[in-house]
Amino acid sequence: MFKVGLCGFGSMGKGHAQLLQKHEGVKLVSIADVRPDCREKAEADYGVKTWECGEAMIAAGGLDVVFICVPTYLHAPLAIQAMTAGCHVFCEKPMAMNTSECADMIAAAKRTGKTLMIGQVLRFWPEYVFLKNAIDSKEYGKLIALSMTRVGGVSTGWDNWYLDESRGGMQIFDRHVHDCDAVLWMLGTPKAVYSYGATRDPRTNGGIFHNFTEYRYSDDFVVSAEGSADTPPGFPFTACYRAVFEKGLIEFNSRLKPTLQVFAGAAPIAPELPDPIAALTSGMNISTAGPYYNEQVYFFDCLRKGVKPEVVTPEAAMETIRVVRTEIESCRARKAITLS
């Protein structure tokens, strides 16, 4: 039986708490959150012991696994404390504030022998897995162009931390990081990035809130991604991509039914995808839990088998942080930046 402690009971924490109930051999035993109303809800919903901070929960002991779902600036210290205390760690994305903190987390995992996995969930999302398989297999020929989009309204979070770059806010870092990670997972690290965007106050109003990034690989194909946190309240969160191949086109749009279509003949086809396992009521800007459950299943399966995660390694998650940080640098320098 894996005894799990959860740091953070906001929208992501609530989602993970719901899904942790679905596993055999896994028991959520404690939840930490600075907000009294969140602790009251955690006690009422799950009957667990609650703590005002994650540090105290970890220090109290009795845990096998810690899930970290707090603002990004707290990821590294909590993950390192948990692994040092003998716990395996599942940490939500982004991995940490910068590559130095990521490296410290990786060093702690190696020193303690504990498993560290980062929640880059698109690697478990059926529509993105389908695209990666198509690129790898060359079923539709060589990739010619890929464009990704992830747009929605403003997120604020506890104490408006999503609007504060110094605490890991800014949509380019917290939301667009999904598509950056997907690009690296499917295509590897580009030679350079060129990013431009609209900016507000980085401490109080979200910093780079709308960006477009070009990932430069070669002259053979083009890759770009758009991210935003500026749509009006009535506009639904939207994630989509369009991938053009030599012999076909794959299009995903989270707002359409079916969400995925392949154009490689006289008429489009909708590939059969795994059914989502549950609806979430956590306040997350998605409606289904399948990919989040899948990454949990994979994490616990790795723990049971005594193997390290390969779908998303800590080193891969650190590389995503390096590239996103370079995108931010590119936005502010208004020029393309080479990735060594």
What positions do the PLM features span?
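Beta-loop-alpha module in the N-terminal Rossmann-like domain of NAD(P)-dependent dehydrogenases
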Residues: H16, Y46-A108, P291
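N-terminal Rossmann-like dinucleotide-binding module
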Residues: M1-D45
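Predominantly a Rossmann-like dinucleotide-binding segment in NAD(P)-dependent oxidoreductases
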Residues: L122-N205, N211, R334
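Hydrophobic residues in well-ordered beta-strands that form the structural core
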Residues: E52, I68, C91, L116-I118, ...
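Rossmann-fold dehydrogenase core element
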Residues: D104-V121, G141-L146
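Contiguous beta-strand/loop segments that form the cofactor/metal-binding neighborhood of enzyme cores
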Residues: D174, C180-T259, Y293-V307
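C-terminal helix-rich "cap/oligomerization" subdomain common to oxidoreductases
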Residues: V65-F67, S218, Y298-S340
